[in-house]
Swiss-Prot record:
This is Chaperonin GroEL. ATP binds at T29, A30, G31, P32, K50, D86, G87, T88, T89, T90, G416, D498. It is found in: Cytoplasm. It comes from the Bacteria. Together with its co-chaperonin GroES, plays an essential role in assisting protein folding. The GroEL-GroES system forms a nano-cage that allows encapsulation of the non-native substrate proteins and provides a physical environment optimized to promote and accelerate protein folding. HAMAP family: CH60. Forms a cylinder of 14 subunits composed of two heptameric rings stacked back-to-back. Interacts with the co-chaperonin GroES. The gene is groEL.
Length: 541
């Protein structure tokens, strides 16, 4: 294996080609009339999806330079997905347009540093303008936000709104595949979520989404640090014999204990994962007690307890219907052994503590515990007549759920690409220090029109230039173009609105990524040698 350095026009041409390929594949999914994409798999039937992030991740060019460029772009899309769970398609469309315009500036011999300064100056102005357009989302608008993100599927929108009503705006909502044929079902169950993720990525069971997913696991709780595997060996052996997974929630798991658990998992032994307990000090102790009540665990092992780790039996452990762990959070869904009486008793105890507390800070923390304990978990079960149908619908449900959370968190702006269009007024008084910096500002002006153009194009209409001209000429910044009805309407009464957080982060990341490519002067890529190819061939003989 040798490598080569690619520079100049060859590099610029490759960047343009890769960006165009990605935008064509991902951009076609934009809007309520966007199309689906089939992704072939090494085994089984192709997966059909409208999830822009999933489409982007699946594109892996064979040519080394193109593969390197695609990888850089996908990493940015991954950030968008991690931060908000939606907006990848918008991010891709914006990135492609900015890079296309920058390529023209480069070809004209413009000063790239000045162009970049103009772009970044315009970016800040647009982001400020977007913030000024936001408004809080009303409870009756939640279904509309979810429907729009689910490509116009009103059933998905109404079910997500039902979930929010069940557990509150800050409640825990998860999505699961159903065994039945019903499109969507909502199930309210006991459960809890806390802000601690897996201690090692090697615990992951779903590599595509970097998740740990356990069904019917045992749950062991301790306030102590676990350094030596010997101390929990009896628990591991008992759980292994049961054939069920194990979740360990402890102050910490480190050293020999963590490495042994990881090695065991990699060798295909016991399905196990470890997370740190939430909170600190006395609050950690209280929160572990809350979790114990939810999962029906008899003990939270600590130094005060006569029962040692080695003495814990299977019947002493907690249980749950399922557990879902990301790198940042753990969600416990549906206890098997807990009782509603024990949960009610614990909540009454916390309510009494709130009454008796004189500290506003303590009261706030107690209310947080009460909300986690009593709120429960809403589970959206996605069904269908085939595995392909279920997976495609689940993608849309998850996107809609992410959009809903973002809308609740930061509010909403006019949808369908209109918000970015109206934010362009912030550039009217913005002047560059020189012609090249002004060119950078104008690049953002053209790029911000790209999402609405793509949404209208995907609807089969060629009216995008006329629509953009009409929206920019009039003064009502709540007016949008609804591609479902092919008419103008008020964004908030018609339900065509986007979460500010999604639009803001997609735009910010797209411009930042394009700025990286602007100053990219060389890429070092590996090139397989003839000897490598011959060796690979000989291995198959």
């Amino acid at each position: 294996m040798s490598n080569t350095v690619v520079t100049g026009e060859v590099l610029d041409k490759s960047i343009r080609e890769v960006v165009r390929i990605l935008e064509d594949a991902v951009g076609c999914t934009a809007g309520p009339k966007g199309l689906t994409v089939a992704i072939s798999k090494p085994y089984g039937s192709p997966e059909i999806t409208k999830d822009g992030y999933k489409v982007m991740k699946s594109i892996k060019p064979e040519e080394p330079l193109a593969a390197a460029i695609a990888s850089i772009i996908t990493q940015s899309a991954s950030q968008c997905n991690d931060k908000v769970g939606d907006g990848t398609t918008t991010c891709s469309i914006l990135t492609a347009k900015v890079i296309e315009e920058v390529s023209k500036a480069k070809a004209a011999g413009s000063d790239i540093v000045s162009i970049k300064n103009g772009i970044l100056k315009a970016k800040e102005a647009v982001l400020t303008a977007l913030m000024s357009m936001r408004r809080e989302v009303e409870e009756d608008e939640i279904a509309q936000v979810a429907t729009l993100s689910a490509n116009g599927d009103k059933n998905i929108g109404s079910k997500i709104a039902q979930c929010v009503k069940e557990v509150g705006k800050d409640g825990v909502i998860t999505v699961e595949e159903s065994k039945g044929f019903k499109d969507l079902e909502v199930e309210k169950t006991d459960g809890m979520q806390f802000d601690r993720g897996y201690l090692s990525p090697y615990f992951v069971t779903n590599a595509e989404k970097m998740l740990v997913e356990f069904e019917n696991p045992y749950i062991f709780l301790t306030e102590k640090k676990i350094n030596l595997v010997q101390s929990i060996l009896p628990i591991l052996e008992n759980v292994a014999r049961s054939g069920r997974p194990l979740l360990i929630i402890a102050e910490d798991v480190e050293g020999e204990a963590l490495s042994t658990l990881v090695l065991n998992k990699l060798r295909g032994g016991l399905q196990v994962a470890a997370v740190k307990a939430p909170g600190f000090g006395d609050r950690r102790k209280d929160m572990l007690g809350d979790i114990a009540v939810i999962v029906g665990a008899k003990y939270v092992v600590n130094d005060e307890l006569a029962v040692k780790m080695e003495d814990i039996a299977l019947s002493d452990l907690g249980t749950a219907k399922s557990v879902r762990i990301t790198k940042d959070a753990t969600t416990i869904i549906g206890s098997v052994d807990s009782s509603s009486e024990s949960i009610a008793s614990r909540t009454n105890q916390i309510k009494a503590q709130i009454e008796n507390s004189s500290s506003d800070y303590d009261k706030e923390k107690l209310r947080e515990r009460l909300a986690k304990l009593s709120g429960g978990v809403a589970v959206l079960k996605v069904g269908g007549s085939s595995e392909v149908e279920v997976k495609e619908r689940k993608d849309r449900v998850e996107d809609a759920l992410h959009a809903t959370r973002a809308a609740v968190e930061e509010g909403v702006v006019p949808g369908g690409g209109a918000a970015l269009l109206y934010a362009l007024s912030s550039l009217d008084g913005l002047k560059g220090k020189n012609d090249d910096e002004q060119w950078g500002i104008d690049i953002i002006r053209r790029a911000a029109c790209a999402p609405i153009k793509r949404i209208i194009k995907n609807s089969g209409s060629e009216e995008a230039p006329c629509v953009i001209q009409h929206l920019l000429k009039q003064n009502d910044k709540e007016l949008i173009y609804n591609v479902d009805t092919m008419n103008y309407a008020n964004a908030f009464t018609s339900g065509v609105m986007d979460p500010l957080k999604v639009v803001r982060i997609a735009f910010d990341l797209a411009v930042s990524l394009a700025a990286v490519f602007m100053t990219l002067n060389a890429v070092v890529v590996d090139v397989p040698s003839k000897n490598d190819a011959a060796g690979a061939g000989a291995g198959g003989m």
